[in-house]
């Protein structure tokens, strides 16, 4: 059991080291893009399925509430939280439309729309990101594995270099925390 724990912790460290080596510049670009958008009166929309839905909610909570600094709330919406909206859209239009329909209703030009997908192939996330781009939003993918089909349709992809879902999710939440920290420091010096 201890060997398994040690192996998992080692694998987690390797992913974090890869983020530093391979994605630091992209993380900085993501933070700058989001800070500029929020400073300009725009909002963050974020989505994902399963564990990525939880990460979307976590991200929105840090932006609306606070991360580390006492500050005013900033506009962010997790498109994963309203069961009535999700089930109505899913029932009437299908599961692939649950995020796209919300982007249609809520996204404005200049907003930042983030799709989180460990595979990079979540169809409902992909469809929403495509519509967001059509509407003039900036699109970001927090992805895993090889980035999947989403990698090619977003303005900026942050693909965690791992094929192991738990390690990808750990990479995503680390990126989210770093971005929240950088956004707060930039907007509330």
Curated annotation (Swiss-Prot):
Residues 34-189 form the SIS domain. Its main location: cytoplasm. Zn(2+) binds at residues 58, 62, 169, 177. Keywords: Carbohydrate metabolism, Cytoplasm, Isomerase, Metal-binding, Zinc. InterPro entries: GmhA/DiaA, Phosphoheptose_Isoase, SIS_dom, SIS_dom_sf, SIS_GmhA/DiaA_subfam. It is found in: Cytoplasm. Binds 1 zinc ion per subunit. GO terms for biological process: carbohydrate metabolic process; D-glycero-D-manno-heptose 7-phosphate biosynthetic process; positive regulation of DNA-templated DNA replication initiation. The keyword Ubl conjugation does not apply. The keyword Cytoplasm applies. It holds the Pfam family SIS_2. Pathway: Carbohydrate biosynthesis; D-glycero-D-manno-heptose 7-phosphate biosynthesis; D-glycero-alpha-D-manno-heptose 7-phosphate and D-glycero-beta-D-manno-heptose 7-phosphate from sedoheptulose 7-phosphate: step 1/1. Its EC number is 5.3.1.28. CDD domains: SIS_GmhA. Its cofactor is Zn(2+). GO terms for cellular component: cytoplasm; DnaA-DiaA complex. It catalyses: 2 D-sedoheptulose 7-phosphate = D-glycero-alpha-D-manno-heptose 7-phosphate + D-glycero-beta-D-manno-heptose 7-phosphate. Substrate binds at residues 49-51, 62, 91-92, 117-119, 122, 169. Coiled coil: none annotated. One of its GO terms (molecular function) is D-sedoheptulose 7-phosphate isomerase activity. Catalyzes the isomerization of sedoheptulose 7-phosphate in D-glycero-D-manno-heptose 7-phosphate. Belongs to the SIS family. GmhA subfamily. Homotetramer. The reaction produces a racemic mixture of D-glycero-alpha-D-manno-heptose 7-phosphate and D-glycero-beta-D-manno-heptose 7-phosphate. This is Phosphoheptose isomerase. It comes from Geobacter sulfurreducens (strain ATCC 51573 / DSM 12127 / PCA).
């Amino acid at each position: 059991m201890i060997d398994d724990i040690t192996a998992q912790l080692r694998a987690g460290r390797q992913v974090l080291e890869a983020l530093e080596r391979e994605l630091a510049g992209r993380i900085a670009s993501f933070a700058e893009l989001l800070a500029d958008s929020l400073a300009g009166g725009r909002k963050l929309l974020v989505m994902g399925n399963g564990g990525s839905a939880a990460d979307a909610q976590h991200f929105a909570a840090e932006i609306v509430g606070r991360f580390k600094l006492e500050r005013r709330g900033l506009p962010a919406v997790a498109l994963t939280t309203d069961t009535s909206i999700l089930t109505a859209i899913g029932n009437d239009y299908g599961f692939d439309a649950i995020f796209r329909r919300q982007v249609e209703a809520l996204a404005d030009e200049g907003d930042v729309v983030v799709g989180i997908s460990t595979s990079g192939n979540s169809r409902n996330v992909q469809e929403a990101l495509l519509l967001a781009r059509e509407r003039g939003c900036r699109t970001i993918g927090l992805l895993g594995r090889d980035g999947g089909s989403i990698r090619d349709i977003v303005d900026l992809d942050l693909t965690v270099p791992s094929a192991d879902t738990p390690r990808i999710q750990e990479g995503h939440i680390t990126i989210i925390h770093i971005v929240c920290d950088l956004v707060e420091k930039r907007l509330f010096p």
